[in-house]
Amino acid sequence: MFTDPMPLLTVSDGTAIIQLNRPDQLNALDYATIDMLMRYLDLLETDETVRAVILTGSGRAFSAGADIKGFAASIAAGPEVALRDLVRRGQGLTRRIESYPKPIIAAVNGLAFGGGCEVVEACPLAIAADTARFAKPEINLGFPPPFGGTQRLPRLIGRKRALQMILTGDSIDAAEAQRIGLVNMVVSEEQLMIAARALVAKIAAKPAVAVSACLASVTRGINSAIDEALAVEASQFARTVVTQDIHEGIRAFMERRPASFTGR
């Protein structure tokens, strides 16, 4: 039985919103929360009415990172248990987010530290409130980021900037996060969910298979050698050739009219 509040899930107008819901713990990612996020993602992947997912937090934090108090027992039990319970779980979540076939947009409403920052890194798109802050404070606890942050952050912002954040634990504000490429845009706190929904609406108007193909091409390609990445791009292009939407898109272009996509 879960004793802590679980993430909230709402679905409307083709958009799923997952809200981390442990505000008193700054939405720290304990085992139960991670497991429930994975269940939600499994559920939403097969729901054809859902075109995109918005991930946000309640209270003043997006997520302050791993629930260290809860993970302490795993760490105390030694490397094998810590790797099984903590690292594989956390990396499994961020890998699931990164490779998800539908867009997941991080709507960063406040602190995104440690594992919370790693979740943002894994999301293909991110919008931050102007009050948000980002940090990699794991070094102050004696370990490196374990949820994929040592690999994704350098790919996003460059090796030197990433190492400065990882080795110092210093935080950056939302404007700096946008400048270095950690988030796409910064808006006021009041406009955060409005901006996230607007981005979802723009993407949802595009052909669903093509959106999924673009996500797969970029995510898988950026982690591959160029020849392998080009093969991924070609295979994803082939996915779209058999769809109705590609023919509709080409006809609409030739006829100089807006396309009417069906997701087929």
Model-derived segments and spans:
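Hydrophobic alpha-helical membrane-association signature
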Residues: 33-36, 86-89, 192, 233
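Terminal peptide-recognition signature
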Residues: 18, 22, 36-37, 55, ...
